[in-house]
UniProtKB/Swiss-Prot annotation:
One of its GO terms (molecular function) is S-methyl-5-thioribose-1-phosphate isomerase activity. This is Methylthioribose-1-phosphate isomerase. The record marks C162 as: Transition state stabilizer. Substrate binds at R53, G54, A55, R90, Q201, N251, K252. Coiled coil: none annotated. It comes from Dechloromonas aromatica (strain RCB). Pfam families: IF-2B. Its EC number is 5.3.1.23. Pathway: Amino-acid biosynthesis; L-methionine biosynthesis via salvage pathway; L-methionine from S-methyl-5-thio-alpha-D-ribose 1-phosphate: step 1/6. PANTHER family: METHYLTHIORIBOSE-1-PHOSPHATE ISOMERASE. The active site is at D241 (proton donor).
Length: 362
């Protein structure tokens, strides 16, 4: 996608294959800052601190982090330590574990001296596959938008939650890929952007939509139901951090409430995700671990002060107890359809297996 009109991806590997550069998303939308990741520990920190976030981008970053780790030492012990460290950073995002398992399955049988080159090649393949899959999701989603248009020149009002755009992937995004596809095809589209407290990832969505020229409006999370009730929303689309085998969806906390509001107002609720987000080994949403993050994300508000200096302000009295779950689970019956790189399917085991019959072996 574009930043100031320049095609840009969220991460880039150095030609010497010793490091990667990532966008520090904790500094957006106020500053675009690139960070060099040159050690295993830096890669783990980038994922844990949400300098990179979004399940597909987490997976790609972890793959490169493993390649970086093997630059220093490629022994069996180093491989196991790197997989364990990276795998513990974000428990809900299944793309992380998918990418690490894929890397380890390829690297483990190789002699240590062959692992470094193979690791960098496989990490690059994971990144390129992510771009292609997300572009395909966009085209499948565009067909759904066309079905919603009932009058020439009608503006489609799409609501989203959190950030599942290109900042959450290597490029294109998942939930926003159909939005970009529609905009680029000349379909009038407007996006209601939910702020997504407490980390306000909706600001990232608004920032990237602005970069691409897509009309949008930022809203408070609690305004979503009112907009639906007043007929101002044609569809809701979100990404996912993990989709269970039965079609239950783990996504940013607050997703479940939007799905409930959609059901009450007859609005289709779509989930967009690539194969790497599908966890066929997880039978249902109740089996998905829910990450609990530091309460200071809730206690503190980050922004720029009157001088334009980044600042953090405490909004709660000292010692106030808070709960800060990062995700919730939306049951499959609230999901109109799941959009993947292979097509659109019902949110059910049968629906997913129709697109991925090779998984029926399990």
């Amino acid at each position: 996608m574009n930043i100031d009109g320049i095609p840009t991806r969220t991460l880039r590997a150095h030609p010497d294959r010793r490091a990667i550069d990532i966008i520090d998303q904790t500094r957006l939308p106020h500053a675009l800052h690139w960070v060099r990741v040159a050690t295993l520990e830096e890669a783990a920190h980038a994922i844990r601190a949400m300098q990179v976030r979004g399940a597909p981008l987490i997976g790609a970053t972890a793959a490169y982090g493993l390649a970086i780790a093997l630059d220093f030492e490629a022994s069996d012990r180093r491989l196991a330590e790197a997989v364990a460290l990276l795998g513990a950073t974000r428990p809900t995002a299944v793309n992380l574990h998918w990418a690490l398992a894929r890397m380890e399955n390829i690297l483990r049988p190789l002699a240590p001296e062959a692992r470094c080159d193979a690791a960098w090649a496989e990490a690059a393949a994971i990144a390129e596959e992510d771009v292609a899959q997300n572009a395909a999701i966009g085209q499948h989603g565009l067909k759904l938008w066309n079905d919603l248009i009932v009058a020439d020149g009608q503006t489609l009002n799409i609501m989203t939650h959190c950030n599942a755009g290109w900042l959450a992937t290597v490029d294109w995004g998942t939930a926003l890929s159909p939005v970009y596809a529609a905009h680029d095809a000349g379909v009038p589209v407007h996006v209601w952007v939910s702020e997504t407290r407490p980390r306000n990832q909706g600001l990232l969505t608004a920032w990237e939509l602005e970069q691409h020229g897509v009309p949008h409006t930022l809203i408070a999370d609690n305004a979503a139901g009112l907009l639906m009730r007043n007929g101002k929303v044609d569809a809701v689309i979100v990404g996912a951090d993990r989709i269970a085998a039965n079609g239950d969806v783990a996504n940013k906390v607050g997703t479940y409430l939007k799905a409930l509001a959609c059901a009450d107002n007859g609005i289709p609720f779509y989930v967009a995700a690539p194969r790497s987000t599908l966890d066929f080994a997880c039978p249902e949403g109740a089996s998905i671990p829910i990450e609990e993050r530091d309460g200071d994300e809730f206690r503190l508000v980050h922004g720029l002060d009157s001088r334009g200096v980044p600042s953090a302000l405490r909004q709660l009295p000292a010692g106030e107890d808070v709960a800060n779950p990062a995700f919730d689970v939306t049951p499959n019956w609230l999901v109109k359809a799941i959009i993947t790189e292979r097509g659109v399917c019902p949110a059910s085991r049968d629906g997913l297996l129709a697109l991925y019959p090779e998984e029926a072996r399990g």
